[in-house]
Structures are given as structure tokens and as C-alpha cells.
Amino acid sequence: ISYNEISMLTWASDNQLVKKYQMIYYTNNPTAARKMFPETVKIISNPIKGFFHQLSSKYVFVEQNGHQWMCRPAHKQLMVQLWHGTPIKKVGNLNHTTHWFSYDDVFSRVLAPSEYAWSIMRKCFSYSDNKKIICPYPRCDELLSQNAKDLRKKLGLDDKSRIGVWLPTFRTAYYETHGSNDAPDFPILTENNINILNGLLKRSNTTVIVKMHVLQRRLPFFDTNYSNIIFMDNAALVDMEMSLYSLLGASDCLISDYSSVIFDYLLVNKPIVFTVDDYYSYKDNRGFIDEDMFNNVPGPTAHDVEELVNSIESVLTKDAYESERNTLCRKMNKEEIRLGDYAATVFRQLGIEK
């Protein structure tokens, strides 16, 4: 699911841009997309039609660097790269990746949430400065769309239950491609310790929602029912009529690792716990763009189940990292733009008005 594209299209639909523009969403999952958008949005999944509309549309929004049809924008067309997060791992130029195309040639405008984030984009992809749009990601508008009480009701939890959302980054493919034998299937959790984690969470009246990466290899314990651990995928969120970011906005804390979602979560200034059990192997195999940042993360770190539960309990009891989160947020997200106005700001910077 391309969350920035969805947030942009949702804002456009809600604000009557459909009266001025035909809105088309290309996807390989039209059934799920149909649930998310009104009938005024045309949903297509045929690749030939998708390529035709990419070539013939005035504005094209993409979220991946290697989307299906890479080519120069057509005459008077704007190809807008929204990105799916500020790179943390070495990618593009820093990963010695080569393509038949130039990154700078195929995009008319490129989104970055801050000037510092833009400097990372330039290192990775050699984008020209005149293509930048500085604005936090439109998907972050959804952080305001769900309150905690409603989320607990949807999940069947009591009013006093604390909710942590766990978003592990994807690991396996990179490790396998690069011949590493120490690839974890999943950070910290195994079939041998997941019941221990569940028991410790139950004692502290905390429920952890694990949102699995779309490419995560499915493990046996994902399909087991636990009292205080819930595994979710994109389909489950669609069925609940929720987005990942509305789920994050209603949570009490985030658990993550080497994922750019941590920069988005800074906008709500809630605690973050970092799982770092494979930090050194991940660093050696993948590499970090800003290693110092991960030596000074704004939250406690956990190497095992016991440390994870203790870290969650500590940040939900006494938040000792608020100042550090605020400092990092100012670095990673442009302050002057109000949360809830990000999609609108991107449209305005492109000259698209209601």
C-alpha cells in the first residue's frame, strides 16, 4: 500500500478536486482500493491502461523509486516522487546501485520532509535542487484521524489498556541476496519466546499490535491467537477501515528499529522503543547513512524480550526522552507546516488549488 499516494488522493476527493480533475488510482489490489475511495475515483489494475494513463495524465504521483514504468515525464507533465520515507539505509548512489535511467531525469518534483532529509535524498539520488518540495509526508495527516478510545473499542480492549504498535523493517531479502547466514526471520521474537512476551504484556495490561511488512515471510506464530499480541497485515487494516497512520496516531508508543516511520511518529511526540538485537549484522550488511543517529536514538533500546517489555513499561510510566524526540523532529520534519495540512501543502506547491 502506498500511503502517501492514498493520503493525497483522499484529500483530493474530500476537497472536491474531482470536479476539476479525473482521479485515477492504479493498483494490483483493486478490491481493497475500492473500499478506500469514493466512486468518483477511477480504479484500474490493467497494466496497459496504467501505462497509458501515466503517459497521458498531467500529474502523476509515485511513491517508489523503481515503479513499474520508469521513463521521462511527457511534455508539460509533472511526475511527482512522494517517496515512502527518508532513507536510513544506504540506497542508490550510496549503495552503488546503477540503473539504465538517471533518477533526476525521471521525476519533475521530489518530496522531502525537511532540508536535512533533502540533503540525504541528494546524496542517494543526485536530485537537482530545483525539484525539491519540502513538506512532511502527506500520510502523516492520518495521525490525527483516529482516537485511542475508538481504537480500543475496535480491538475489544478495555479503556485502560495501553497500546504499542510494532513496525519492524524488512530484513530477509537483503540478507539472503548478500549471502549472510545470520539473518533473523523477525527481530527479537521467536516461537520459543513469544509466549513469554505475551505473559509479560498481559501483566502490565499492554497490547502490542505487530504490523507486518508486506514482504515479511510469514512465520507460524503469526497465525496464533494471543491475548496481548495482535498480528496485522494491510488486509486487516482495510477490513477495519483504518490506515496504518491512523493506527499509529491512536497508539501509546511505537516499537521499531531501522525504519523511517520513527521520523513520522516524532510528529505526535509519543514514546519510541528501539529493537536493536541485530544492529551490528544489519549495519555491516546494509549500512546506515547517518550512523551517529542510531548511536543516539531518542528512546530505550531492547535486545531481547525482557528488555522490550521493560522498555515499554518505562516509557509509558515516565517519558524521559521527550526533549530528544523534539530535537530530532525539528531536524527531520519541517516545523512551519501544521500537522493535518501536509497533503494540501504539497498540492499548493504544485499549483493545484481547489
Indicate where each model-derived feature is located.
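C-terminal alpha-helical cap of glycosyltransferases
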Residues: 336-354
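Active-site and donor-binding regions of nucleotide-sugar-utilizing enzymes
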Residues: 1-144
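Donor nucleotide-activated moiety binding/catalytic core segment of transferases
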Residues: 43-57, 215-260
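Catalytic binding pocket for nucleotide-activated donors in carbohydrate/polymer assembly enzymes
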Residues: 225-227, 260-332
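A donor-sugar binding/catalytic signature common to diverse glycosyltransferases
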Residues: 60-83, 87, 239-286
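Structural motif
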Residues: 59, 78, 109, 163, ...
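Conserved catalytic-core segment of nucleotide-activated headgroup transferases in glycan assembly
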Residues: 3-12, 138-225, 302
